[in-house]
């Protein structure tokens, strides 16, 4: 209904809105070329002669006369039904009525349509039999040209083959476009600079309108060839918020421009004749928008949805948009799922799983008996096989739901007729039952079922939609017993869509429609295979030489529905919901979630202080800085009370700095090689450091000496972690090792027990590791850009994701353990879903990001240039750049309350940062 509201808004603002004519009066794939003011002469030459004033429209397949008086019907004469076309009075016919200056055009035909009499939207009336109509143009000098045009179009309409008809009409259209160009006088400002101009068609539901596209340094223009519905459509580039490349007829020819963030309907949809023209225009607008608008991907929206920052409804709208679904293209209208299974109860129980449809199955597989019949036919079918002959979304299905608010669109689609009364959208329950039991009915729903506008359920236009077999007239849609009104029905449908059950299972439906079960063997296994022509890449129209075959295929593509563009090729992650106590499958991943403090919803994870700190992270200010090392700082750890700061450096020293006295208290050297990281054991009695000399050193703070040395690797140790008496060490020897570290019986004595529990082998050097909150999962980053997620309960590799083009600098789990963030020398910040291993967000900076801390939504990273960058992952943007070090930021520490931050850098400094509240 978004396109209906858009049209109504435009009509309210424009003088031409009083016209009854619209492009919907044309046949599908028909063009409107020109109009002439004229009189329709009735009873020419008799005493009863009278004139009806109006406009004569010349179209590629018909002649349409729109009387000025709404009491008179619009007249549509198909050119294929014309017997003779000529100037009135030629060949002796009615010659004595023809004056020298007559502007008469005579049409003799066998069939005529009468439309919108008294401006009432109703099925077209048809009159058959040989008739002659005479139209007298206001400009007599135009008669000859108009007659010549009509004769040419008549020849095209009478060709035997549909492909030949289309080819000839296309040639006529292209000739007209070639003889015209964009009128530069239509520029908003004389100083505008023209960037490019090309031919295109403006796409609206069921119709296209050819013309010229022009883009300048400030505006995008479209000038229709026929001047309808207005001389020029103008969009200010500064107002553009979103722009998408579109498939049109499975061809890469479409471009859709939005001037709003959330509106379902765009400001203009253009179809180009050449892909290069589309790409050039897209590039120009995208370049203009680059510094004004953040670009969103399916992965970035997924992250927002998982985190609860997008509702299920909003997420589905975004996925539809990214998958080429548009309200301007009814063959690719946004598709939404049936959610509710119960349409018979008096009360709707959203706490009962039985209330809901099984979202893991396509509609065609919900009925077991029907599915068995379909599978039998599928097995017997020659290649290419398909299970369902009709699609889950098509122009017919969209208008089936919207006929009460979009009757003219239905009449356009069905050649001037409404559907049989018993086959119309009469009842929610009947429609659902037919989707379950019908032999060829597998349709899903549209966004309107989860919106706020009830008009598609109510016959507010008082349309005569026919009488059913039982004698009742088709009127408002019959609602289920649990809905007291259309408003109540939509509200409960929205509640169902946003329910916990749907939130926990919506990813299964996304897998079918937008994801990995859409194509290939996974689609076969999910009983989700449709006709090949519905899929992108199913046919190359440019390779088809037979014009009839090409037109037939294009017609099938446009009229029988198209499968959305595939957005995901791996299983879609689940949503994080407050009710998420355990996942349905049993795995170590689930065990880690059960033990994790991230078990609750994301909002429950953060205490008030953490939330306050991250909300003000962009206000970070440099408080104090100290140069305490001779080389780059590599690690920072702080005592629990915050008084002592321990740092490691490439100068091979561990240093202890007093925050209170602001003085260096100790400097310890274990070898002549760099130290790479450090951490404090619980109790603040021992510091552990890793070294490039292949060892891990234990230092007793109380006794001021090296307590123990673990010689466990064959190359430099790059990073260490500790949890629950277990040491995790990463090394350039391509391993991560897990050790048990039994505490010493007496403080200061040596640790004698370092048992190797597991060895996680890699193909290349490991540069960084991190544990999740429960220490059941470990993530490692390698020299060649691979991020690996390990299950520590079984010491097995869960996922290996090659997501960086250089060294992985740092990795960390989100507080709820559901995502991993990684940074690299390639400047990328990548977010990975732990359950599926899917890369769900990737942002890029112009320099390497060496280290970071994050809360799941925002990231504070240290860059190669010395800046601290604040990233908004959900908004996919850099929120703030904060000056700090004079060299690369190499390490960053944040306390548990997120109130204290310390960074170290290649400039040999440690910097204490202050949050401004």
Swiss-Prot record:
Ranges of the WD repeats in the UniProt entry: 628-658, 670-700, 712-740, 761-791, 803-833, 884-914
Residue ranges constituting the BEACH domain according to the UniProt record: 290-575
Listed GO CC annotations: cytoplasm; cytosol; membrane
Repeat recorded as keyword: yes
Domain GRAM: 176-247
Database matches in InterPro entries: BEACH_dom, BEACH_dom_sf, BEACH_Domain, GRAM, PH-BEACH_dom, PH-like_dom_sf, WD40/YVTN_repeat-like_dom_sf, WD40_repeat_dom_sf
Pfam families: Beach, GRAM, PH_FAN, WD40
Gene3D superfamilies: BEACH domain, Pleckstrin-homology domain (PH domain)/Phosphotyrosine-binding domain (PTB), YVTN repeat-like/Quinoprotein amine dehydrogenase
Residue ranges of every copy of the BEACH-type PH domain listed in the record: 189-286
Tissue specificity annotation: Ubiquitous.
GO biological process, one term: signal transduction
Keywords assigned: Repeat, WD repeat
Function: Couples the p55 TNF-receptor (TNF-R55 / TNFR1) to neutral sphingomyelinase (N-SMASE). Specifically binds to the N-smase activation domain of TNF-R55. May regulate ceramide production by N-SMASE.
Official protein name in the record: Protein FAN
């Amino acid at each position: 209904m978004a396109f209906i509201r858009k049209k109504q808004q435009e009509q309210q603002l424009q003088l031409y809105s009083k016209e009854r004519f619209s492009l919907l009066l044309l046949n599908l794939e028909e063009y409107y070329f020109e109009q002439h003011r004229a009189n329709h002469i009735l009873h020419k030459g008799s005493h009863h002669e009278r004139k009806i004033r109006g406009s004569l429209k010349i179209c590629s397949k018909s002649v349409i006369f729109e009387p000025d008086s709404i009491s008179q019907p619009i007249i549509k004469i198909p050119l294929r039904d014309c017997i003779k076309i000529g100037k009135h009075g030629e060949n002796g016919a009615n010659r004595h009525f023809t004056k020298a200056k007559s502007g008469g055009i005579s049409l003799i035909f066998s069939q005529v349509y009468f439309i919108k009499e008294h401006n009432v939207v109703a099925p077209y009336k048809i009159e058959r039999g040989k008739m002659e109509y005479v139209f007298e143009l206001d400009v007599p000098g135009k008669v000859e040209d108009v007659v010549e045009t009509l004769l040419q179009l008549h020849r095209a309409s009478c060709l035997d083959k549909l492909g030949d008809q289309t080819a000839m009409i296309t040639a006529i259209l292209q000739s007209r476009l070639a003889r015209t160009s964009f009128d530069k006088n239509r520029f908003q400002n004389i100083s505008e600079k023209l960037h490019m101009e090309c031919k295109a068609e403006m796409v609206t539901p069921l119709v296209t309108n050819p013309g010229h596209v022009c883009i300048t340094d400030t505006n995008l223009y479209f000038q229709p060839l026929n001047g309808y519905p207005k001389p020029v459509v103008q969009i200010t580039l500064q107002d553009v918020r979103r722009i998408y490349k579109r498939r049109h007829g499975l061809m890469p020819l479409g471009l859709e421009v939005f001037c709003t963030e959330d509106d379902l309907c765009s400001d203009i949809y253009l179809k180009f004749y050449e892909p290069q023209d589309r790409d050039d225009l897209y590039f120009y607008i995208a370049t203009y928008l680059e510094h004004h608008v953040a670009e969103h991907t399916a992965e970035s929206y997924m992250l927002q949805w998982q985190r609860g920052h997008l509702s299920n409804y909003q997420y589905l709208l975004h996925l539809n948009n990214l998958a080429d679904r548009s309200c301007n293209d009814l063959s690719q209208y946004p598709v939404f799922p049936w959610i509710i299974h119960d349409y018979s109860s008096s009360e709707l129980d959203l706490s009962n799983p039985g209330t809901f449809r099984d979202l893991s199955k396509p509609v065609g597989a919900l009925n077991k008996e029907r599915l068995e019949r379909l599978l039998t036919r599928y097995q017997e079918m020659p290649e290419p096989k398909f299970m369902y002959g009709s699609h889950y979304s098509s122009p017919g299905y969209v208008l089936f739901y919207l006929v009460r608010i979009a009757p003219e669109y239905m009449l356009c689609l069905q050649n001037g007729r409404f559907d049989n009364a018993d086959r119309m959208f009469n009842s929610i329950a009947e429609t659902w039952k037919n989707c379950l039991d019908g032999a060829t009915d597998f349709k899903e729903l549209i966004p309107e079922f989860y919106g706020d506008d009830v008009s598609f359920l109510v016959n507010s236009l008082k349309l005569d939609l026919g009488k059913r077999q039982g004698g009742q007239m088709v009127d408002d849609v019959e609602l289920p017993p649990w809905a007291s009104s259309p408003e109540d029905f939509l509200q409960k449908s929205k509640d169902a869509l946003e329910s916990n059950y749907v939130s926990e299972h919506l990813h299964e439906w996304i897998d079918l429609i937008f994801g990995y079960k859409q194509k290939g063997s996974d689609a076969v296994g999910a009983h989700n295979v449709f006709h090949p022509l519905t899929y992108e890449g199913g046919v190359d129209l440019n390779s088809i030489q037979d014009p009839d075959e090409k037109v037939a295929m294009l017609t099938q593509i446009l009229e029988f529905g198209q499968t959305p563009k595939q957005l995901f090729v791996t299983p879609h992650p689940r949503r994080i919901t407050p009710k998420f106590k355990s996942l349905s499958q049993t795995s170590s991943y689930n065990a880690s979630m059960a033990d994790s403090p991230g078990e609750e919803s994301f909002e429950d994870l953060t205490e008030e202080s953490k939330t306050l700190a991250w909300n003000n992270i962009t206000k970070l200010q440099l408080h104090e800085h100290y140069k305490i090392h001779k080389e780059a700082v590599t690690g920072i750890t702080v005592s629990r009370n915050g008084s002592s700061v321990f740092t490691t450096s490439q100068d091979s020293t561990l240093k202890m700095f007093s925050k209170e006295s602001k003085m260096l208290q100790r400097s310890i050297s274990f070898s002549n090689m760099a130290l790479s990281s450090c951490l404090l054991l619980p109790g603040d009695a021992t510091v552990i450091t890793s070294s490039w000399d292949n060892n891990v050193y234990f230092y007793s703070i109380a006794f001021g000496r090296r307590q123990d040395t673990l010689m466990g690797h064959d190359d430099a140790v790059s990073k260490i972690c500790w949890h629950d008496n277990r040491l995790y060490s990463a090394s350039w020897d391509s391993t991560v090792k897990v050790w048990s570290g039994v505490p010493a019986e007496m403080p200061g004595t040596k640790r004698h027990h370092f048992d190797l529990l597991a060895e996680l082998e890699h193909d290349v050097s490991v540069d960084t590791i991190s544990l999740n909150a429960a220490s059941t999962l470990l993530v490692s980053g390698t020299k060649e850009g691979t991020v690996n997620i390990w299950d520590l309960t079984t010491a097995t590799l869960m996922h290996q994701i090659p997501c960086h083009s250089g060294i992985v600098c740092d990795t960390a789990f989100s507080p709820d353990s559901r995502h991993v963030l990684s940074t690299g020398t390639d400047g990328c910040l990548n977010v990975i879903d732990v359950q599926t291993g899917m890369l769900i967000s990737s942002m890029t900076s112009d320099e390497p990001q060496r280290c970071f801390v994050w809360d799941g939504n925002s990231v504070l990273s240290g860059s190669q240039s010395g800046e601290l960058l604040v990233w908004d992952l959900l908004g996919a943007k850099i929120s703030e750049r904060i000056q700090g070090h004079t060299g690369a930021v190499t390490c960053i520490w944040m306390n548990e309350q997120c109130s204290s931050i310390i960074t170290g850098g290649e400039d040999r400094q440690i910097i204490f940062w202050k949050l401004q509240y």
